[in-house]
């Protein structure tokens, strides 16, 4: 993405916007100027002079992956190209880390990961520039050599202010400024990954259980992801009961299950396995805290209960 950057220098030959000369792409910015002449209470306007300023700096910003998930790390690459004969130094990169309005202020869904800055000029790694973690993230002391390029790479952590629902996005904006240039703005958008995020916990009751008594295992499956687990996902739960249980009673989300269609149990080894396609878990729902702006996750939950005689 290119923005207008105004710069003038000697011996500029006329070129068209976007024209390639000696392997370099040049872009034009046009300006106009008009003078006035006042005399004897009269005012005369001059003709309008039209000039063009040759752009020599361009920039682009990309994410290594265009999707994110909860607590993910995103790697950003900012590339600055100098198509002119003069080195630019003292440039500053300011990244808003995806800040967006909330209430009367803003919240920021990304946090800079300390120590991850990499700074290259013409492909050669340079000493790390000065970094202020922010938000916003500020990287200063950038130099772009004449006819060359600079690349800044850094990582950001997805935090509690990042929306996670389906079709959510983080729009990230960075501005390159300083060194006498007109600021250049670059943007990158990443999308919330569509996926389930499952955890499972197991509890037992009663504790202790009497010999030849009934023992119950409860499996709580939680989904903090924005996508439900459906039959075609073929989720399976496997367990080996020790001590081995007999006379099993199994239910899933309060509905009794039958051995064969829903599960398989080997009473000689204690191995229990659900049949693929029977375990389903709804997607999570999300709500934003009205005070802090942090996103609260309400997991989707399914429960498998297995009881048997010890």
Describe every region a protein language model picked out.
Residues 1-27:
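N-terminal amphipathic/basic-hydrophobic helices that include classical n-h-c signal peptides
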Residues 14, 23-310:
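Exported/extracytosolic protein signature
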């Amino acid at each position: 993405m290119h923005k207008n950057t105004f710069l003038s220098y000697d011996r500029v030959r006329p070129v068209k916007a976007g024209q390639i000369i000696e392997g370099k792409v040049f872009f034009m910015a046009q300006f106009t100027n008009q003078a006035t002449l006042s005399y004897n209470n009269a005012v005369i306007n001059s003709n309008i002079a039209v000039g063009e300023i040759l752009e020599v700096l361009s920039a682009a910003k990309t994410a290594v992956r265009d999707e994110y998930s909860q607590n993910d790390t995103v790697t950003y690459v900012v590339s600055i190209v100098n198509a002119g004969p003069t080195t630019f130094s003292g440039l500053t990169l300011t990244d808003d880390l995806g800040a967006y309005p909330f209430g009367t202020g803003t919240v920021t869904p990304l946090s800079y990961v300390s120590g991850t800055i990499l700074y290259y000029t013409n492909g050669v790694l340079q000493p790390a520039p000065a970094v202020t973690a922010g938000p916003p993230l500020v990287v200063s002391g950038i130099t772009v050599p004449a006819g060359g390029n600079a690349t800044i790479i850094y990582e950001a952590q997805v935090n509690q202010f990042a929306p996670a629902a389906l079709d959510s996005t983080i729009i990230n904006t960075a501005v390159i400024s300083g060194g006498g240039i007109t600021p250049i703005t670059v943007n990158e958008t990443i999308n919330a990954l569509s996926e389930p995020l499952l955890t499972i916990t197991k509890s037992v009751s009663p504790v202790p259980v009497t010999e030849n008594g009934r023992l119950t295992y409860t499996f709580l499956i939680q989904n903090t992801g924005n996508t439900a687990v459906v039959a075609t996902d073929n989720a399976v739960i496997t367990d080996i009961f020790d001590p081995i249980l007999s006379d099993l009673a199994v239910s899933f989300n309060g509905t009794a299950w039958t051995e064969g269609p829903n599960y398989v149990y080997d009473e000689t080894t204690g191995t229990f396995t659900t049949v693929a396609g029977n375990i389903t878990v709804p997607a999570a729902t999300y709500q934003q805290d009205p005070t802090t702006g942090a996103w609260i996750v309400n997991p989707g939950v399914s429960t498998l209960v297995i009881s048997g005689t010890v």
